């Protein structure tokens, strides 16, 4: 969640305060607005899911289905949002002087560490098979 939140901050700062194109702030262009709005919406939804699942976990209720679903959703979201940040920054998105490229690399790592996204999907289906008696 933190990677995506920082990417949203970077997109807003850059497009609303620092970058002009054709005598307008970058954030006044529809495609940039869509990237920022989509990023915030994805982040907000993933945050709600993660917090909801985390608040219900205790020693008696591990909720592995919820945990795997939340990790999968959050890592996918972080990759999408960090990719959007690179898009908003354009060529600067690839430069090491801007943090977007590092954040994107870190977001990709999230889908590997702590259980790959593929492992999370396998766990989700395994839990659903158990729930539905298959």
Annotate each PLM feature.
Residues 1-134:
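Alpha-helical interface subdomain recognition
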């Amino acid at each position: 969640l933190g990677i995506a939140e920082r990417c949203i901050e970077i997109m807003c700062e850059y497009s609303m305060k620092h970058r002009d194109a054709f005598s307008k702030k970058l954030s006044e262009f529809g495609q940039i607005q869509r990237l920022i709005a989509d990023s915030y919406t994805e982040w907000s939804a993933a945050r709600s899911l993660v917090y909801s699942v985390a608040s219900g976990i205790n020693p008696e209720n591990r909720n592995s289905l919820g945990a795997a679903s939340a990790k999968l959703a959050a890592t996918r979201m972080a990759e999408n949002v960090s990719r959007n940040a690179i898009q908003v920054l354009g060529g600067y998105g690839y430069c090491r002087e801007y943090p977007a490229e590092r954040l994107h690399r870190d977001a990709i790592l999230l889908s590997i560490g702590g259980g790959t996204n593929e492992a999370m999907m396998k766990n989700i289906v395994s839990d659903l098979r158990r729930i539905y008696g298959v």
